[in-house]
Swiss-Prot record:
GO terms for molecular function: ATP binding; metal ion binding; ribosomal S6-glutamic acid ligase activity. Mn(2+) 1 binds at residues 255, 267. Coiled coil: none annotated. Its EC number is 6.3.2.-. It comes from Histophilus somni (strain 129Pt) (Haemophilus somnus). Residues 112-294 form the ATP-grasp domain. Binds 2 magnesium or manganese ions per subunit. Mg(2+) 2 binds at residues 267, 269. This is Probable alpha-L-glutamate ligase. It holds the Pfam family RimK. It comes from the Bacteria. Mg(2+) 1 binds at residues 255, 267. Keywords: ATP-binding, Ligase, Magnesium, Manganese, Metal-binding, Nucleotide-binding, Protein biosynthesis.
Length: 299
């Protein structure tokens, strides 16, 4: 197969592992930055064209069609990355997470709404408009309070407000800067830990428990967190699969938390990192992703 990976940083561990696995399985793979793409729509055939420019001084060239697309772009590239994914989906080319599912997962509030609609428990959450009083809005959520920007990954854009006064100050400042925030209950009993479930298709292929640094409420690897092996219950596996399916994803990193109220889904990541979970679980996830693409291509 001829594969395309959409990625801004091809040197990242996840991109390198997927490239190695694809080539080891006999496939050709290009790694391109979606922000260096140009999409063209025309009344006359061909109606859809996609060009690529290696650098600002190079001549753009027309990209060929591929057999499958692997999206690995970050939150800052979501708009262009999803436009490129839609281009290929329009041509009936398999995308390992299409643009529709990607956009659902990348919008934190929308994803929480969709999960809740399907009866999937999430932390108590609230979203207020720019003209709604922050002082009144914060009363809907417990204190301490988690504040999250609607778009972001790797723990970036997540703030713990220790009291309501701090929460209001942060909300008013960021609202003034036109940065919308959602509010969530802080799950104190989790003590800075969560469970990452890596889902491919209809299977949870790997898991780990992530542990935040001392005095750090975020358990993300990129925030200096560590990880250890963990055995999921059957209920946790079912929940991870249900959350993935709810957003229409083929591949997902589902973050769960064990709370006093029961299992909660914190987030569903459409482009989950491989490094920490491969090293913790000892499972070759990159290979399993390539094998999943092969199965879809043969259908």
């Amino acid at each position: 197969m001829k594969l395309l990976m959409l990625c801004r940083e091809p040197r990242l561990y996840s991109c390198q592992r997927l490239k190695e696995s694809a080539e080891d399985n006999g496939h050709q793979i290009d790694i391109l930055d979606p922000n260096r793409c140009l999409l063209k729509l025309s009344k006359n055939a061909p109606h859809f064209e996609l060009y690529y420019q290696v650098n600002s001084k190079s001549e753009p060239y027309l990209l060929p069609d591929y057999d499958a697309i692997i999206p690995r772009f970050g939150s800052t590239s979501t708009r262009m990355g999803c436009a490129v994914l839609r281009h290929f989906r329009t041509k009936n080319i398999f995308c390992l997470n299409d643009d529709v599912a990607f956009l659902k997962a990348r919008d934190k509030w929308l994803s929480l709404q969709l999960l809740t609609e399907q009866g999937i428990a999430v932390p108590n959450s609230a979203l207020s408009g720019a003209e709604f009083s922050a002082t009144q809005a914060i009363l809907q959520i417990q204190s301490p309070t988690i504040l999250k920007t609607l778009h972001g990954s790797q723990g970036i854009g997540v703030i713990l407000a220790e009291n309501r006064k701090s929460a209001v100050s942060i909300m008013e400042t960021l609202t003034q800067a036109d940065v919308p925030l959602l509010m969530q209950d802080f799950i104190q009993e989790a003590q800075g830990t969560d469970i990452r479930c890596f889902v491919i298709g209809d299977k949870v292929v790997a898991t780990m428990q992530r542990i935040g640094q001392e005095d750090e409420f975020r358990a993300n690897f990129h925030r200096g967190g560590s990880a250890e092996k963990i055995q999921l219950t059957e209920q946790e596996k079912v929940l991870a699969l249900k959350a993935t399916k709810c957003l229409g994803l083929d591949v997902a990193g589902v973050d769960l938390i064990r709370s006093k109220q029961g299992l909660l889904v914190l987030e569903v990541n459409a482009s989950p990192g491989l490094e920490m979970i491969e090293k913790t679980s000892g499972i070759d996830i990159a290979l399993q992703m390539i094998v999943h693409i092969e199965k879809q291509f043969k259908r």
